[in-house]
Amino acid sequence: SLTPMSIMAIVATNLKRGQCIQYEGERGVVLGLEHRTPGKGNALIAATIRSFKTGKTKTIRFASSEKVDIVETDRQKLEFSYSEPGTYHFMDPTTYDTIGIDEDFVGDAKNFIKEGQVIEILFIEGNPVSIDLPDTVELEITESSEGIKGDTANNPTKPAVLETGLTVQVPLFVKQGDIIKVSTKDNGYLGRAN
């Protein structure tokens, strides 16, 4: 039986990054907060929020004394075990329980998740609503052509396929078997891992 979702109202000035709120009929996670005091006006809180439904971010302005509905969430650190068509399987490292998460929900995060990696997944009422990836991940290059010798004009790059299947542009000196750092924000190459 479904219990009513735990929601509590707090004053906007007490909002914190990472909290989940209900707003304009949607739910989302607070990514950033900015306190603004325009001229003689009242103080405002500009909250950058990512919608769980659409994945899009937008800025919502609250009066600092305005009440905001906080949704109770459960943040779990889960280890990626394996995937099969349609489902990604994660394990709770403390209880060893496994949980299957729909591939559509995992979305582009699959490009950055490898077996044995621990990531944070946010749940509301037992349903996953958000995957929190680290800003950078280290992945092995499984396929890459040799760079063309003498081609050094304008920082040339070449495509490389990583162990997750993601293709990124890398400098010519990087080779198959290298482990590189990749940005989860823009798929950018950030250097070789030590």
Predicted regions and their residues:
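Short, Lys/Arg-enriched N-terminal segments with co-localized hydrophobic residues
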Residues: 1-7
